[in-house]
Amino acid sequence: ILEHLSGYKNSKPVRIGNDAYHQKQNDSFGYLMDLIYQYYRLMPGTLDEIEDMWEMVKSILSTVMEDWKKPDKGIWEIRGESRHFVSSKVMCWVALDRGAKIASMLNKYGYSERWQKEADKVWQDVMTYGWKEELQSFSQTYDNMAMDSSLLLMEPYGFIAADDIRYHKTVKAVKKALLHKGLMYRYNSEDDFGLPSSAFTICTFWLIRALFVIGEKEEARC
């Protein structure tokens, strides 16, 4: 806390730093690996350059292979106890899936097969422990029944198809639980600050897209 500085409209105190810097956030590997894969997929002329990044790709995937089974703080940087967040598992699947595809691009089929097999294990794990029959929806974590907007990202990253009834039901459940006055909350579980009290803009756009891809175009427009 910097007591000697003021912010916008003389607001005080100024705070610096972020307690999340030391957290384990397993979802981050998926975003990075998807970015690397999409870059080379969309710019095939740069395929030879993949070799320059191959060591980094192997390092990332080695970590994912080791850590995907472990609890983490999740996409929202929860400061409480580490949990098995469904969205983190999904993004670990993304990392392994994209790594397998990159390995295939380089004809490194041993790596591709190994990573794809591990991706299949993650997929089955999520389907077994993330889907809740009682809710007829995926839930925020393996051990709770809360809704989370990040579940809407399962389809755009290719983890589940838009026409899969489980995704359709999850979209509906997330919307029912988290949409308030036209805006989406991130989740409805308590964190270290209590229950969420404000919306999160990007989550509203995730919902709009999700409604559109499951065929609810009128709802998406509203």
Regions found by a protein language model. Name each.
Residues I1-V126, S149-L153:
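The feature captures the catalytic groove of carbohydrate-active enzymes
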